[in-house]
Design a protein with these regions (language model features):
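Claisen-condensing/thiolase-fold acyl-transfer catalytic domains that form or cleave C-C bonds
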Residues: 1-117
Length: 118
């Protein structure tokens, strides 16, 4: 359950709010842990592991963090989104999180921004 506590800290340190995050990549060591994080943080399910989590893609022991970062970065670039929060659960309830930003983000072509301009 560590990501439920690590994600808000990382997001706050980045000067953002949970609403600013376009996608959350949360390691799915266990389904119950990810469901808890979604409910505890009040996240929209469509913004969490949209390409499938470790249960669907596999749990690459020893390289979970790398897989999460690459998946999040690819999602941001492919969908012209700006921010992702990436988080790992660690044994005994600990967690780690980071926020990444798409350096190629173009707000003029972002669907949500375009709608907001109308």
């Amino acid at each position: 359950i560590g990501p439920a506590f690590a994600i808000p800290v990382a997001v706050r340190k980045a000067g953002l709010s949970l609403d600013d995050i376009d996608v959350f990549e949360i390691n799915e060591a266990f389904a119950a842990q990810t469901v808890f994080c979604i409910k505890f943080l009040g996240l929209r399910e469509d913004r969490v592991n949209p390409l499938g989590g470790a249960i669907a893609l596999g749990h690459p022991l020893g390289s979970s963090g790398a897989r999460l970062l690459v998946t999040a970065a690819n999602f941001l670039q492919a969908n012209n989104k700006r921010y992702a929060a990436v988080s790992l659960c660690v044994g005994t309830g600990m967690g780690a999180a980071a926020v990444i930003e798409n350096p190629h983000y173009d707000p003029s072509t972002d669907e949500a921004t375009s709608r907001a301009k109308l």
